[in-house]
A protein has these predicted regions:
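A structural boundary/capping signal
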Residues: 1-145
Length: 145
């Protein structure tokens, strides 16, 4: 048993290293896409997965899609960008309570998209990713500036 334990530790270390490299490679591939095809949420989730290897990116992409569906329903048949942004704000702010973390701005969890989606708490850049990606999935053209 004394021989097996160090081997398991070694395998675990290598597994963690390979997992991080895989996540970094997926992130690099994501951001190498042309800007029009860039899936900001996927890139942000692969970045988060480097720190959290058990993260299932598809689960969080599905959550963004679910939020987008709710935005589409909230917008209904109302035309125009004001109606679109009102529906987006209604779902993300009023219903889901996404907000800035004013108590602990520098908490690393504010930067990882999975944690922002779990906690509904983030910093301006991570909350912007939520708004942009939910809006995009809901058919609302939003661009960062």
């Amino acid at each position: 048993m004394k021989v097996v334990a160090p081997m398991i530790d070694d395998i675990t270390k290598h597994s963690d290293t390979y997992s991080r490299l895989y996540c970094r490679q997926r992130f690099a591939t994501s951001v190498a896409s042309p800007e029009a095809e860039l899936d900001l949420a996927s890139a942000a989730l692969w970045l988060a997965a480097e720190d959290c290897p058990e993260l299932d990116t598809q689960v969080y992409l599905g959550r963004l899609e679910s939020l987008a569906e709710r935005v589409r329903v909230a917008r209904g048949n109302r035309p125009g960008s004001v109606a679109a942004l009102d529906a987006l704000r209604s779902v993300l702010v009023e219903e889901e309570n996404f907000r800035g973390n004013t108590n602990s701005y520098y908490d690393p969890k504010n930067s990882f998209l999975n944690k922002v989606l779990d906690r509904r708490l983030g910093i301006p850049i991570s909350l912007s990713i939520v708004w942009i990606e939910v809006g995009r999935r809901a058919g609302i053209p939003i661009e960062g500036v």
